[in-house]
Amino acid sequence: MENLDALVAQALEAVQRAEDITTLEQIRVQFLGKKGELTQVMKTLGNLPAEERPKVGALINDAKERVTDVLNARKAGFEEAELNARLAAECIDVTLPGRGQTTGGLHPITRTLERIEQFFTHIGYGIAEGPEVEDDYHNFEALNIPGHHPARAMHDTFYFNANMLLRTHTSPVQVRTMESSQPPIRIVCPGRVYRCDSDITHSPMFHQVEGLLIDRGINFADLKGTIEEFLRVFFEKELAVRFRPSFFPFTEPSAEVDIQCVMCSGKGCRVCKQTGWLEVMGCGMVHPNVLRMSGIDPEEFQGFAFGMGAERLAMLRYGVNDLRLFFDNDLRFLAQFR
């Protein structure tokens, strides 16, 4: 048993000298593993007389338990020290400023659409929507643009087949509203429209807002007053406005609306091509043929319509010189409009 006591003393001394958990594991294998020194002592019991085996076996088991307990205690100490060191390294100073959250913002086109809708709903207009995949009748025929009409050349249209297409304006929403509702009608129709055109001032997909008012006794003065007030509120400036005679198949008389250049205050600059004026929208009195085709008697009811591009107004309001910037998804650009 002197040999057993020496092995235990040797094991305990090795445990005390160990500096990490890896060394402790090596000591465990050395003394308690399958081929460990204390395990080998246990295997010598077979050489002892039968009456001595229980006593010696108990001594060996006691020795193994002592070594195991000291090993486990030492290992627990290392684990606690390691945990404390990690906690100290990962300690959070609660007095430091928190990590700020980067807040998003509405897209400038969305802001522009909301601004337009807010004005018109405030004066009693409703919001109307319709399908973006439209039929030829509602996109052209019902708007006084028959198949042979030269005005169709004004629209570079995306066709699916001879009858179905991507709408080129939101005017079909007005037609569908007139077909399903009785006057008085006061609506604005915001939405995406599609034309085969792409350059610095055009996109194959863009946003348009068209308005329609149908009632008794409506005249061009009502249209003029509505548009002038809208432009004043939208740009938050007292801008000069002019109406130039123009042509649209679905309105008569028709006009283009110009405003005094917001960049140079009418003095003339590169943006307005030295004219002092910027075109912002088209308008006119609803053509009698359009009213008739929608089931409304033009002898009893009159109306006006107008249409504007949201991107065009956004470019003027925010001073953007390239329409494509709105759709490039560049956060450096979009973050300016929070």
UniProtKB/Swiss-Prot annotation:
Keyword line: Aminoacyl-tRNA synthetase, ATP-binding, Cytoplasm, Ligase, Magnesium, Metal-binding, Nucleotide-binding, Protein biosynthesis
Residues involved in Mg(2+) binding: 252
GO process annotations (BP): phenylalanyl-tRNA aminoacylation
GO molecular function annotation: ATP binding; magnesium ion binding; phenylalanine-tRNA ligase activity; tRNA binding
Subunit structure of this chain's protein: Tetramer of two alpha and two beta subunits.
Catalytic activity: tRNA(Phe) + L-phenylalanine + ATP = L-phenylalanyl-tRNA(Phe) + AMP + diphosphate + H(+)
Main location per the UniProt record: cytoplasm
UniProt superkingdom: Bacteria
Name assigned to this protein: Phenylalanine--tRNA ligase alpha subunit
InterPro entries the UniProt entry points to: aa-tRNA-synth_II, aa-tRNA-synth_II/BPL/LPL, Phe-tRNA-synth_IIc_asu, Phe-tRNA_ligase_II_N, Phe_tRNA_ligase_alpha1_bac, Phenylalanyl-tRNA_Synthase, tRNA-bd_arm
Gene3D superfamilies: Bira Bifunctional Protein, Domain 2 (3.30.930.10)
Record's cofactor remark: Binds 2 magnesium ions per tetramer.
Its EC number(s): 6.1.1.20
Cofactor section: Mg(2+)
Family assignment from sequence similarity: Belongs to the class-II aminoacyl-tRNA synthetase family. Phe-tRNA synthetase alpha subunit type 1 subfamily.
